[in-house]
């Protein structure tokens, strides 16, 4: 036997009859036609009490062709016991058995009505367009240090070095200061970086000369009345005021270079005995002609 679902109509001759699926265990090769209503009598199996269904006309030739009665006769083999779970179902003429829609209640496999055996469910083939994923690659050896360093993100490149202003490198080199040699003629206009180069050289020369003058003024001021206690030092610092006036004129670069030769840093030389005043050179005597303001705290114009 095979458990199947079969379609059944609610009415045989009604055009508006509805269809429903009826669960049965009927085999398709045991159907008997009723001559009166044009229906089939379905038996569940061929061992149903070993009784066969036949038409009355087959047994008695005098019977009416419209006789609806069904007679049974004993079979030749041993009778089987009747089972309450077995039933007979009627289907209208023209009904079809949908083998493609018959599924077992367990496992979802398709049933065959010919022999009552259950066919295994077919596996769905993979789609043609989908490519099979490659198996995961298993490393045969641990990664080396070079591979580990290659996986790390590269550090950002160092920012480009900022270009130095024109003339700054020559000033830091410690060489003598000199203005730009271009243009050659005195009345020609400056162009390019000439203006910025000459400006940087001028500022460096003034800075060196002013540093030398400040060192000389500070040394002279300290020698006038050197403090001897912390209280004297505080009073001295409050009263000290040194003003530097740079007026070398055209000799600015010469004075700056001479200062650079005596003190490479542009300041007064600091010997083992402390600060020593620079000797009075011709350029220094010319710079002393530029007198500071009258209210200046320290004036060394008359100092010998």
UniProtKB/Swiss-Prot annotation:
One of its GO terms (cellular component) is viral tegument. Keywords: Host cytoplasm, Host Golgi apparatus, Host nucleus, Phosphoprotein, Virion, Virion tegument. Highly phosphorylated in the host cell. Packaging is selective for underphosphorylated forms. Interacts with gE (via C-terminus); this interaction is necessary for the recruitment of VP22 to the Golgi and its packaging into virions. Interacts with gM (via C-terminus). Interacts with VP16; this interaction allows the formation of a tripartite complex composed of VP16, VP22 and UL41/VHS. Interacts with the capsid-binding protein UL16. Interacts with host CGAS. Residues 23-68, 112-184, 262-304 are annotated as: Disordered. This is Tegument protein VP22. Residues 280-289 have a biased composition (Basic residues). Tegument protein that plays different roles during the time course of infection. Participates in both the accumulation of viral mRNAs and viral protein translation at late time of infection. Modulates the RNase activity of the virion host shutoff protein UL41 probably to ensure necessary levels of key cellular mRNAs and proteins. Plays a role in microtubule reorganization that occurs after viral infection by stabilizing microtubule network. It comes from Equine herpesvirus 1 (strain Ab4p). Residues 143-154 have a biased composition (Low complexity). A motif (Nuclear localization signal) lies at residues 160-163. Residues 123-142 have a biased composition (Pro residues). A motif (Nuclear export signal) lies at residues 233-245. Disulfide bonds: none annotated. The keyword Phosphoprotein applies. Belongs to the alphaherpesvirinae VP22 tegument protein family. It is found in: Virion tegument; Host cytoplasm; Host nucleus; Host Golgi apparatus. Residues 43-58 have a biased composition (Basic and acidic residues).
